[in-house]
Amino acid sequence: MAGEATRQQGDLAELTLLASLPAPWNQGCLEPLASGLTNGNYRLHLPSGQRAFLRRGHPDPVRFGIDRATEWQLYQGAVGQGLALPCYHSEPASGLMLLAWCDEPNWAAAPPPLAAQPPLLAAVLRRLHRLPLPAVVMAVRAHSAGYRDRLARVPAWLPALERALLASREPDDCWLPCHHDLNPANLLGHRPWVIDWEYGAAGHPGFELASIQRTHGWSDELRCQLESCYLEGRGGAHKLLNTKGFQAEAFLPWVDYIGLLWALLMAEQQPGPDYQALIDMNRQRLE
């Protein structure tokens, strides 16, 4: 009985979501997709055969450091740069987005050859860095502190684990438009198309590269290849990087720390093996 009631509630929520869309999209039907870790995702089918991707944003974006206005600003710029899929309808305040459908698989399902990945992502970063700099900044220390402050319960092992990192000094001398979540699931096709801009903000490009290295499981060598491809595409050392390069290595522990805190937050809201695996992995990296 409880399972049936839950299913009916889900069906009603989908009908309500569909009815909220403008014509002709409200005449379609929704097919739930494997959801991201914070959003609800659907394939929308119209009677004409046209398809679209519908994303329902997380109802509490502030909890995860998401600024919807900045997400929309960066997304629109990314469409202009050929990085993001066109949008048919959006409600930026709620994070609802209806996008053109893409049949190409993401890199988690069908990654390009490993040797092709650094130049492809270098091209993504070069176009990303042409966008106007957002006013909202995602500085790793403040961002991680926000996550930590929102924890309902701080694990007993966390203070000792974070002490050395919080006593260190991270690079803070370069700010560029960043996506902050260029993981394989957010890259579609060989192009690639970039989706899920909700963590986008001004950020340090070193954190962006460190995040790529961690989420793609790259070696230091592959990360350095990406850096070289980026600089070659700009004709050498570029003023955007203040002549110091990306300084990505300094941000690897910050990627692990923020990933740990994010997983702890999610596990408080929705306990499960996926979040526990992320907690265990990032904790081990920081030990």
Which residues are covered by each model-predicted region?
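ATP/Mg2+ or Mg2+-diphosphate-binding catalytic cores
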Residues: 261-287
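Start-of-helix signal in alpha-solenoid helical-repeat scaffolds, especially tetratricopeptide repeats
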Residues: 68, 251-254
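Active-site activation/catalytic loop segments of kinase-like enzymes and analogous catalytic loops
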Residues: 206-238, 253-271
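A general structural signal marking secondary-structure boundaries and capping sites
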Residues: 82, 125-133, 168-169, 216, ...
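ATP-binding pocket architecture of kinase catalytic cores
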Residues: 32-137
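Active-site acidic catalytic loop and adjacent metal/ATP-binding pocket
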Residues: 34-46, 50-54, 165-207
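An alpha-helical support segment within catalytic cores of ATP-dependent transferases
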Residues: 8-25, 130-180, 184, 281-284
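Conserved N-terminal boundary motif of the eukaryotic protein kinase catalytic domain
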Residues: 24-32
